[in-house]
């Protein structure tokens, strides 16, 4: 039985899932929006929202925690100095997922995930 096993495997091992989440989070925070599959967007959302909530702390410790997952210094700087203050009064829900149709090659549902 698969009870209590939250999360999606995305046909990857655990280190590849972490690498995918970090890479997509970096791209989303740099660009403001990215297009990906619906399943990947649903997995990315809590990862990014936790990063932004951590960044809202605003201190050195918060910056170092964000830098553990975002390895691009420019993106870390942007998250700490621009993104986190923007959502200072917002208690969560920093991202939005919009369906944008299906991919022609394999018919998978595509989605646009963006910062609100």
From Swiss-Prot:
Q: Which GO terms describe its biological process?
A: translation
Pfam short name (any one): Ribosomal_L17
What keywords is this UniProt entry annotated with?
Ribonucleoprotein, Ribosomal protein, RNA-binding, rRNA-binding
Q: Name one GO cellular component term.
A: cytosolic large ribosomal subunit
**Alphabetical list of PROSITE patterns matching this protein:** RIBOSOMAL_L17
Q: Which Gene3D superfamilies match?
A: Ribosomal protein L17 (3.90.1030.10)
Cysteines paired by S-S bonds: none
| GO MF annotation terms | rRNA binding; structural constituent of ribosome
Subunit note: Part of the 50S ribosomal subunit. Contacts proteins L3 and L32.
Protein family: Belongs to the bacterial ribosomal protein bL17 family.
State what this protein does: Binds to the 23S rRNA.
What is this protein's record name? Large ribosomal subunit protein bL17
Q: Which organism is it from?
A: Deinococcus radiodurans (strain ATCC 13939 / DSM 20539 / JCM 16871 / CCUG 27074 / LMG 4051 / NBRC 15346 / NCIMB 9279 / VKM B-1422 / R1)
Q: Lineage in the entry?
A: Bacteria, Thermotogati, Deinococcota, Deinococci, Deinococcales
Supply the gene name. Answer: rplQ
């Amino acid at each position: 039985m698969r009870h209590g096993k939250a999360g999606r495997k995305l046909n990857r091992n655990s280190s590849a899932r972490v690498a995918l989440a970090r890479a997509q989070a970096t791209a989303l925070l740099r660009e403001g929006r990215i297009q990906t599959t619906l399943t990947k967007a649903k997995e990315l959302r809590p990862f990014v929202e936790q990063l932004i909530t951590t960044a809202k702390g605003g201190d050195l410790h918060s910056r170092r925690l964000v830098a553990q997952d975002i390895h691009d210094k420019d993106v870390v700087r942007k998250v700490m100095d621009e993104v986190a203050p923007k959502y200072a009064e917002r208690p969560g829900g920093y991202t939005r997922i919009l369906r944008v149709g299906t991919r022609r090659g394999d018919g998978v549902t595509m989605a646009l995930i963006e910062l609100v």
